[in-house]
Swiss-Prot record:
GO terms for molecular function: glyoxylate reductase (NADPH) activity; hydroxypyruvate reductase (NADH) activity; hydroxypyruvate reductase (NADPH) activity; NAD binding. InterPro entries: D-isomer_2-hydroxyacid_DH, D-isomer_2_OHA_DH_cat_dom, D-isomer_DH_CS, D-isomer_DH_NAD-bd, Glyo/OHPyrv_Rdtase_B, NAD(P)-bd_dom_sf. It catalyses: glycolate + NADP(+) = glyoxylate + NADPH + H(+); (R)-glycerate + NAD(+) = 3-hydroxypyruvate + NADH + H(+); (R)-glycerate + NADP(+) = 3-hydroxypyruvate + NADPH + H(+). Catalyzes the NADPH-dependent reduction of glyoxylate and hydroxypyruvate into glycolate and glycerate, respectively. Its EC number is 1.1.1.79, 1.1.1.81. Homodimer. This is Glyoxylate/hydroxypyruvate reductase B. The active site is at R237, E266, H285. The keyword NAD applies. It is found in: Cytoplasm. Disulfide bonds: none annotated.
Length: 324
């Protein structure tokens, strides 16, 4: 008899078929208490869980006594109670490598669109404001040869540094938990403390996961240390930034502009002051949102769940010691 798994995110037909070759698959719309209650028998028997954008906490795990592995279609897993999963010896699988290049593309797009005011001036053209040769009020700022500060030199940080160094001749500063020898050798990146990075960078790109240590890592104190001409980019996790402090820094002119793919609350409220600022490029968490990459992430998540329930946890596992 095939193990039972719950799928709470739609999959392409071929990936669903692959999953069904190994498991009895039960599809649900979400993991809300109402859904769990209505499908209590299914949740009670499930050995696997696959999906994204839902909280998996101790209360849910209490309803799933046979759960052995959960697989998320994402690299981030701050919506999972890792301690609760680990205490119950439940494996947590994620997709850390599939989206690296695409997210780095998004970061570079935010750098370019904020510096060159692409969104702002495009809207002005559509509004009929381009009636003569443009003047300084339409100008942006150069990207090439400007200093890029990367906070978080992981896979995505490395991919961004590659684009910036080779494509735009940008000097690279970085701050991370440890020195990154490859970044220093390949891109001539310079490790520095966070204060130095903030003070010297023309672009500050934040690429950090959300943890207890990183929550509101960026606040009023950090923005005050940046150049008035600096541009802030966040494509990591929204709550790493105190959004009210960011809004205040933009309003006071402490920083020049911001390119944001993530926010403290998502979707972003239509009343957010960020949406009325011409110097803010706000996009709806599109970091990995291409057809190719989202398919690759889903395929990886399916393979991860198959591997996990077969006892193979050599890669993509957040808590591999559970299998020991």
């Amino acid at each position: 008899m095939k193990p039972s798994v719950i799928l709470y995110k739609a999959l392409p037909d071929d990936l669903l078929q692959r999953l069904q070759e190994h498991f009895t698959v039960h599809q649900v719309a979400n993991l809300s208490p109402q859904t769990v209650e209505q499908n209590a028998a299914i949740f009670a028997e499930a050995e696997g869980l696959l999906g994204s954008n839902e909280n998996v906490d101790a209360a849910l795990l209490e309803k799933m006594p046979k759960l052995r592995a959960t697989s998320t279609i994402s690299v981030g897993y701050d919506n999972f109670d890792v301690d609760a999963l680990t205490a119950r010896k439940i494996l947590l699988m994620h997709t850390p490598t599939v989206l690296t290049e695409t997210v780095a593309d998004t970061l570079m797009a935010l750098v370019l669109s904020t510096a060159r005011r692409v969104v702002e001036v495009a809207e002005r053209v559509k509004a009929g404001e381009w009636t003569a040769s443009i003047g300084p009020d339409w100008y942006g700022t150069d990207v090439h040869h400007k200093t890029l500060g990367i906070v978080g030199m992981g896979r995505i940080g490395m991919a961004l540094a590659q684009r910036a160094h080779f494509g735009f001749n940008m000097p690279i500063l970085y701050n991370a938990r440890r020195h990154h020898k490859e970044a220093e050798e390949r891109f001539n990146a310079r490790y520095c403390d966070l204060d130095t990075l903030l003070q010297e960078s023309d672009f500050v790109c934040l690429i950090l996961p959300l943890t207890d240590e990183t929550h509101h890592l960026f606040g009023a104190e950090q923005f005050a240390k940046m150049k008035p001409s600096a541009i802030f980019i966040n494509a990591g996790r929204g709550p790493v930034v105190d959004e009210n402090a960011l809004i205040a820094a933009l309003q006071k002119g402490e920083i020049h502009a911001a390119g944001l793919d993530v926010f403290e609350q998502e979707p972003l409220s239509v009343d957010s002051p960020l949406l009325s600022m011409a110097n803010v490029v706000a996009v709806p968490h599109i970091g990995s949102a291409t057809h190719e990459t989202r398919y690759g992430m889903a395929a990886c998540a399916v393979d991860n769940l198959i591997d996990a329930l077969q006892g193979k946890v050599e890669k993509n596992c957040v808590n591999p010691h559970v299998a020991d």
